[in-house]
Structures are given as C-alpha cells and as structure tokens.
C-alpha cells in the first residue's frame, strides 16, 4: 500500500467512525470480533429462514447462498475478516464441505487476486482448526 492510499484509507475509517458516533454513540466501541464470539454459529433453522427457501422458495438453498457470500467477501480482500470467519462457520453448519469452501475461494482469485485468495484460505483454515479442536 502506498502512503497516499494508506492515508486515504485511515481518513475513510475515521470518517466512518465519526458517522457511527453521530448516528448511535453506542456504536463507537462496536467490535465485530466480539460479535463473532457472542454468536459463533446461527441455528440451522434461522439459517434456512434467512438464507434458504423460506423467503426464496424457488431460489437457492442456505449452503449455496453462504458459498456465494464467501466468494463475495473473498473478493473484498482482508477487509472483512470477522465476517468471513463467521460465514465459513455458517457454511459448514449449513452442510458445505471444506472442499466446497476452498473451491469457492479459489474461484475468486480471478476477481479479487491471489493475495485476497490467500488471505481467505488462511482464514478458512483457522476456522477449520477451531472446529477440529471442538
């Protein structure tokens, strides 16, 4: 990252934090990682309701929607690590295999680049390791 880009990025973060404070002062200290610890996985029934066939009877099932979400987050690079960790965990709970998750991430290398793919794979592997420990 160039210094100019880094400075711009920091200004954007600061601006976002100021906006959050203006809308809701309680959001000033919101930490997505704390949210991840609070709700490690969403119950399967809720997953199916939100991402599955409840609202989209003829649409995609929860597993497919979550794999698409993993792809979208991967393309963003390392900007949404807690969200990717939660989505990988949710996809596993919805029946996705580690191989399907990895293939989804590999496919995104064409759109997000190799560094984004590598970071997403590292995050997915850390989720797998946590799941294996439990």
Curated annotation (Swiss-Prot):
Described function: May have a role in the regulation of NDH-1 biosynthesis.
Entry GO CC: plasma membrane
Signal peptide: none
Any GO molecular function: peroxiredoxin activity
Main location: membrane
The protein's name in its UniProt record: Uncharacterized 15.0 kDa protein in nqo9-nqo10 intergenic region
Compartments, record wording: Cell membrane
Keywords in alphabetical order: Cell membrane, Membrane
Domain of life: Bacteria
Membrane topology: Peripheral membrane protein
């Amino acid at each position: 990252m160039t210094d100019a880009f880094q400075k711009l990025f920091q200004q954007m973060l600061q601006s976002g934090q100021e906006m959050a404070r203006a809308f809701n002062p309680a959001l000033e200290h919101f930490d997505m990682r704390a949210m991840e610890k609070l709700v490690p996985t969403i119950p399967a029934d809720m997953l199916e309701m939100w991402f599955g066939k409840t609202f989209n009877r003829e649409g995609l099932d929860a597993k497919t929607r979550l794999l698409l979400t993993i792809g979208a987050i991967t393309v963003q690079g390392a900007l949404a690590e807690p969200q990717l960790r939660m989505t990988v965990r949710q996809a596993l709970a919805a029946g996705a295999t580690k191989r399907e998750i990895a293939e989804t991430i590999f496919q995104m290398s064409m759109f997000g680049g190799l560094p984004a793919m590598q970071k997403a794979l590292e995050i997915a592997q850390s989720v797998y390791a946590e799941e294996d420990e439990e």
